[in-house]
Amino acid sequence: MENQPKLNSSKEVIAFLAERFPHCFSAEGEARPLKIGIFQDLVDRVAGEMNLSKTQLRSALRLYTSSWRYLYGVKPGATRVDLDGNPCGELDEQHVEHARKQLEEAKARVQAQRAEQQAKKRERKPRPTTPRRKEGAERKPRAQKPVEKAPKTVKAPREEQHTPVSDISALTVGQALKVKAGQNAMDATVLEITKDGVRVQLNSGMSLIVRAEHLVF
């Protein structure tokens, strides 16, 4: 019997589950809420496949259910599904609220990391300190400073102008625009127009809902 290939990361396990159970897991886009107790169902269904262990399955499930796209799918009225995509009851309010808090905390962490990175870039490098002259050492005569020429003025680069998005209803799925993050604007693509704003996908692959005031062309 030939040895089966081994999946080395949780992302590879998720990709395998999305292919093995396409009506339950998804590799991209909004994810559907999973049935409570689906871990045991997975153990029973994929035991021995791809040399998967329970630890790998548990880690992959934890990564999948903590992703932004999964938390976006945990909303009022959504239905949990089993491995075959069969409905397993609606989400209760407690789980919806828990997912909302997780999503807010994740967004706050990302914003804090970006702010910290921008602050580090703005920090000036400390000036090197000159060693103090030893007592009794002769002072060297100061050299006359050469006449300094007036520095040439360098024109500051023109800031890129952006047009704010005034009406999100005029946007279309697949349209390219930018998301303002502090002083920067990141390229993004429209995925969906929702009542809370616009769901976009950044070039990094991350998808999030953004209000109109943070969108520009």
Swiss-Prot record:
Residue pairs linked by disulfide bridges in the UniProt entry: none
Molecular function in Gene Ontology: RNA strand annealing activity; RNA strand-exchange activity
Entry's transmembrane regions: none
Keywords assigned by UniProt, alphabetized: Chaperone, Cytoplasm, RNA-binding
InterPro entries for the chain: ProQ, ProQ/FinO, ProQ/FinO_sf, ProQ_C
Compositionally skewed regions (Basic residues) per UniProt: 121-131
Localization terms from the record: Cytoplasm
Domain of life: Bacteria
A GO term from the CC aspect: cytosol
UniProt family annotation: Belongs to the ProQ family.
Protein name per UniProt: RNA chaperone ProQ
Designated gene of the protein: proQ
